[in-house]
Amino acid sequence: MSKPSSFHKDHLQQTRRQFVASGKHLLGGAALASLGLPNSALASNDGAVQPHFVPKAKRVIYLHMVGGPSQMDLFDHKPQMDEWYDKDLPESIRKGQRLTTMTSGQARFPIAPSKYKFSAAGECGMMMNTELLPNLAKKADEICWMRSLHTEAINHEPAITAMQTGNQVTGRPCLGSWASYGLGAMNENLPAFVVLVAIPKNREQEQAISSRLWSAGYLPGRHSGVSFRSSNDPILFINNPPGVPNAIRGRSIEGINALNRINYQAIGDPETQTRIQQYEMAFRMQASVPELTDLSSESKQTFDLYGEDAKKPGSFANSALMARRLAERGVRFVQVYHNNWDHHANVSGRMPDQCRDVDRPCYALLEDLKERGMLDDTLVIWGGEFGRTIYSQGGLTKDNYGRDHHPRCFSMWMAGGGAKGGTIYGETDDFSYNIVKDPLHIRDFHATVLHLLGFDHERLNYKHQGLDQRLTGVETAHVVEELLA
């Protein structure tokens, strides 16, 4: 008969006296939390690295447009393409670059000029799609426009993963987790990192959005994002079961955490500490989350600003308003995903829906943050995982077309939080196919965001598998000074 493992021995040898002694300080902490009183141990940043220099941004709201928005239909104006309608993309432009399997077999690569009206917005003269984004255009001088981002990934899963974690391979911490790890929490009653998944009105071709995109990877698990659902309970199982009062729930958590503390002393697994913190956070969120999600305190003026959709849980407008409320309550990093930007076909039928979803809420979010004095230290980011091709995928008419994936150039924008408003950075060729001025790799983008949060991207690291791991990886990355206010 085999002998019990040391793990089992540790548990068999625990006595009631040890249990009580080991857990007594946790009982006090949970009791304080149940009474709504602060607990200095719980309020601490618990090992946060702290900034290397004074940050310009205290928090981030990252609006990720899943699928890859078409840059030449939104922010990268190419009027000369009108003369190229239905002509083949020159090989001198393509330069043998990799294509997806969805278009690599096409006999032709016919140019599809954008059908939308562009005009200059703001004093900065940003040429953008004012037909579909009239409200966002009003903020042109407060926005830092980036038209020369590029990446290596040509398919959604690796591209989204790279955009969020700095690497196409899954299992790395995402940007929100690095922000949580570096800066810690500002509110003991809410997570440092929250994720909202908005539901688009048009759902023709949505991409999978999985929880690994807000994983902490090899960082301690407490830095993972907490996803809020758009209907019913925002977080599953956070409320007490029917018939179970707070006092009993609190005692249950006290007992569980005392056992976890004993386990930690015996085994030393740091994730046990994470589990303790998660139980405590969940208990405190029973009070904080209902208040957060109750929009009855918002004024008529606020709903007039964001639009009626802001009252509909799960809409992008509602998510934008929730992002402001989360930021206002001290959440460090709010990640909002908006799906269905993967326009392989029917751009004219889908792009207007997408822009109607985001145009007014994006304007409203920037205006709302500004009115509340929060925009200067809140960095707002908008963009996807790659761009689209100037040539049409599938059928082409002057009124409709599709576009394939294009990682060689795409557009994004930032506002607030130390980003330089009115800047137009980067330039692509006449076909929006290659970058001709100021290339901006996603590593440089990540380094710049970390800089705005107060971190040297080379010094913000975490020891894992014997290496000092970091968001920007081992390849060279630069902070782009031209993007900084």
Regions found by a protein language model. Name each.
Residues M1-A485:
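Ligand-binding pockets and gating/stacking loops
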